[in-house]
């Protein structure tokens, strides 16, 4: 199914080009803009990417972290202006594109080994 050229042109102008290369298993720090009343601040959400889905303007990724012993997952649109920047802190070595199995693991079992580059 072909995309309407007008829609393609509009979405092309909305795509961000400052996104680092990351995939499932990588640890990232997402600097999200939070609006509280009239104030705006940056909130850092640090965790492991457990999935990426979609393509183009509708692409999203989900980051999982453990906060006070409770697993917290947050899904971000990849090309949203609400995310100030994405930092990749380490690249994980995994064999899956979706890491849902991490939800059942706790402590050291939930660690992901680092991927060696080179």
UniProtKB/Swiss-Prot annotation:
Alphabetically ordered keywords of this record: Ribonucleoprotein, Ribosomal protein
Any one GO molecular-function label of the UniProt entry: structural constituent of ribosome
Q: Which GO terms describe its biological process?
A: translation
Cellular component per GO? cytosolic large ribosomal subunit
Please name one Pfam family that this protein belongs to.
Ribosomal_L19
Which SUPFAM superfamilies does this chain map to?
Translation proteins SH3-like domain
Q: What does this protein do?
A: This protein is located at the 30S-50S ribosomal subunit interface and may play a role in the structure and function of the aminoacyl-tRNA binding site.
Q: Which family does this protein fall into?
A: Belongs to the bacterial ribosomal protein bL19 family.
- Tell me what this protein is called: Large ribosomal subunit protein bL19
Q: Which organism is it from?
A: Ligilactobacillus salivarius (strain UCC118)
